Amino acid sequence: MLKLFAAIAAAVMFGMPLVAHANNDSELQSIRNEIEQLKQSYEKRIEALEKRLKDAEAKAAQAEASASQAQTAAETASARPASANAFNPAVSVILEGTYQNLSQNPNTFRIGGFIPPQNEGVGERGFSLGDSELNFAANIDPYFKGNLTVSLQADNSVEVEEAWFQTLGLSHGLTAKGGRFFSGIGYLNEIHQHNWDFYNAPLAYQVFLGTGPIGNYSNDGVQLKWIAPTDLFMELGAEAGNGNNFPGNGDQNGVGTWALYDHVGGDIGDSYAYRGGISYLQAWPSNRQYSAFDAAGTPVINSFSGNSRLLIGDFVLKWAPHGNSTSTNFKLQGEYMYRIEKGILDFNSVSTTPVPGPYSSYQSGWYLQGVYQFMPRWRFGLRRDQLSSGTVNVGQVQYGILPPQDFPILLGYTPKRSTVMLDYSPSEFSRFRLQYAYDQSRPTGVDDNEWTLQYIFSLGSHGAHTF
């Protein structure tokens, strides 16, 4: 536009001299034509720019409308209840089986010196399906996630191992969990059996937590954990449950058991890592029964009611050269348990003439194991278990009402077991294990030679393993 005005101004300024000196009208007309051409040229360019501006504004308006429609659609979708097709949890299956050769009858297995839980044992002879699992896990919404683990037993029964929800949005390192879950006490208990380094649980887990040969101690209740915001790993946990499982029995209202624990851990250089902890479990069993025999060999049912307190110390040390565990690594693991029980022991409690008496016991047990991966995929392990029946005070015996032989399972004994294993893992989804145990836990003094061949296959997604 400035050039147009300049041209017009120039024409006005020089128009008179041009007219004055023009030789004829054709020269004047030529100048006018040039001015007209300049005007038309600039007008066309202005029109083109105005058209481009309108097109750009139209496209911007269209984009804004599309964004608004997309936002509306997203809000509608989020407000709509999730359909069955939208439910997409992580699903995994654990296939496990064993072949066992046992020199003693597994049906007569008892650990001497301790009130027996209902499911103590060594497994089954011959081929067995083992403890296969079906697991579902998913985030429920931005605030919770859920997990369901169903165990398929060798006797074709189905058991809900875990069914819990856990918070995702709590701040300051806090997480809360509710439902049925493996307790966080000790070290081994939170780890599923297919991730253990040996086929079966330590003897201390059987007599103090009632896990059986391949189980975990679980509860129906609530759990609260806190991870400290420090370079050193520090975890504090508290739990309250119904106490249905040994050492409780759930025969009461309200809270039947509660637990507290503290775990700390960290790195030592670039090749070592450790974790240690202390845990406390308290239960209030009421009429907790167990089957036994009296001095004459007659079957009887005894029951205990009172208070059961368990203290656990655990420690794990891992070594991998410069943090690389692919070729070689070593893991040292151990736990110590000390239990105090006080209350009333009813002799032959289901008869018409039960004989009650005060009861107290101070007992302990431990295990220590080491597992060495000496080359990729191959591992070798050793474990030692030992229990001490400690001090057991049976009122009926102390007061001369009944002879000690009426409580044969509670006579002093030191159960122990030595285990060696070799396993091979073609991949992270499969493992084959050969295990031998020399078991001296029976009070009869008859030792058991236990050979186990085990396979483990993992199908589908699975989470990271515990430290």
Region locations from a protein language model:
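Outer-membrane beta-barrel pore domains
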Residues: 164, 197, 272-467
